[in-house]
Amino acid sequence: IRAGIRRIVMASSETLLGIPFDIDPPYAPLDEEYPSRPESTYAIVKHLEEELARKLVRWDAELSITGLRFSNVMTPDDYAQFPDYSKNPSSRRWNLWGYIDARDGAQAVLRALETAKPGFETYVIANADTVVDTPSAELMATFFPDVELTRELTGNETLLSIEKARRELGYEPKFGWRQTP
C-alpha cells in the first residue's frame, strides 16, 4: 500500500465455505452470500486474510482488494485421475466435487485486476462442471439429501456457484477435464 499499489487480488479459498463438509452446508450451490465457516487451520488463516482486507479498504477508500476463493486447483496432468473419481464419487464429497483449472484461475486473476473497484469483494472461482460424471442433482440427493437446492441443477454443473464472478468479472471457464483429449 505504501508503494502506491491500488489493486490487489489475493488467493483466498473454497475452504471458507465449510470444507470438508463434515457438517452439511445449508444450501447449494454455495455462493459468496454463505457466511465463512472455516473448519481447518488453513481455512481460519484464509478467513483472517479476508478480514484484514476488509479493514484495509475501510482505512483507504481508494484501495481495491479482491479475494478469489479458488476451488481445488488442477492442471491438465491431474485430469488422468478424474475417471477414478467417477468410480468413487464419495472420494470428492469433501469439496462438493469442485475444481478449477489453473489456466482459468489465471484468467480470474486477470479479470479481477481489470474490473477492480474500490472496496473488498470475494468471488468463488471454480470450473463450470464437477470432477465426476454423476449429475450434480444426483450427487446432492445421494450425499446431501437434507440440503436445500436454491435452484434446479443441470447436468454436471458446479455446486460452487460462479455466477457472481461471471456477472461482475466476466469470468467464464474455458478449460476443464472434459475438454482435454
What is each model feature region?
Residues 12-13, 66-72:
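Conserved SDR Rossmann-fold cofactor-binding beta-strand/turn motif
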Residues 37-65:
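Active-site Tyr-X1-5-Lys
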Residues 42-49, 77, 84, 162:
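Conserved N-terminal glycine/acidic-rich loop preference
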Residues 73-90, 95-122:
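Alpha-helical substrate-binding/gating segment
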Residues 103-181:
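C-terminal substrate-binding subdomain of Rossmann-fold SDR/epimerase-dehydratase oxidoreductases
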